């Protein structure tokens, strides 16, 4: 039974505090689409995705209208393409194999445009231990794919807690990001490439979403967005102790999650597919007031990035998880607080005034999801340094048994003090400094960093 106060509170959240459903993401299994013939493979993929997702946008809009809750993005994720390309690429030269992978990516892009979704994820490879020949070709094809498509997102899982870190893949991904930055306008292609440790199979958020091998045939996963709501609550708690702040954030996260599950289940029911999970992540936008950094500042920090930031973020992240887990039994995905620099107005300001640096962001990723996200660095940054930044972040995820990721953008012709404007949800990225000292010899070693011991945890 809802009371009038709750209804008014929800209206305030939506109208004044930027509360919305960030995404309803349809995951589709493509394992049964594999075929030796490339044209048949593409046809199978088209038929499978459109049969489930043809009405996704229309259905989400209908549910949004029914409940008066904005659903900002409608997206699709698919089985990692690296898992279904083996028979298609057999016997092809490297160049032919790369072109075949890109053709599949173009098919995904065309499907996304036809059904009207914002992004389609799953141009992915899972190579935490070793890469198969087809996965190597898929990874090599990513830069070319980014020049040919608009809505396809790529991700590569290079590490897990159980497998360790594949340093060959880490090295390669630094090179892939660097190459992509040089051949796409303002390095925009890099905004659609994520490198993961412990990638979740049910993540609804881009650019790292894919439909994991352990998922069913089709499923709806929902992601909520409520930094503005949490900030409004925290601002009413001046002088209260941190335990009280945590409790109030928990209660707020409960309400946000309950709304996300309601909408996600309704969309799934209308489409005739299973409901998967609601992702508890607080996802910021460039809109003023819809910022994770501003929440931390409302807790009592002069600027996000100063001493105490990691502790405040740990409290926030844990409170959101506790409140969300109470609201739903179907929790998954990344489920934490996102700290993407270019997508968070408060983070952008913190970087611009010198309060927030790459090293502090790395420390913050130890206590939240999902990692170094939408970080713009000077275009002159060498591939080995990009690989080393990736390796550091993968190590944090591997040791701490959590998902970490890197989405980094070396912007050609830009240096510290400059910024690059992407618009929309991707926002504005100030160029952040990286170390001028080389990591090249370390990266050139290759090999695999072994999985960590599980009993001695200090």
From Swiss-Prot:
Protein name per the record:
UPF0210 protein MmarC6_1246
What NCBIfam families does this protein map onto? PRK05313.1
Q: Which CDD domains match?
A: RNR_PFL_like_DUF711
The top of its lineage is: Archaea, Methanobacteriati, Methanobacteriota, Methanomada group, Methanococci
What SUPFAM superfamilies does UniProt report for this protein, alphabetically? Answer: PFL-like glycyl radical enzymes (SSF51998)
**A Pfam family hit:** DUF711
Originating species: Methanococcus maripaludis (strain C6 / ATCC BAA-1332)
HAMAP family for this protein: UPF0210 (MF_01221)
PANTHER family reported for this sequence: UPF0210 PROTEIN MJ1665, UPF0210 PROTEIN SPR0218
Q: Identify its protein family.
A: Belongs to the UPF0210 family.
Q: Which domain of life is it from?
A: Archaea
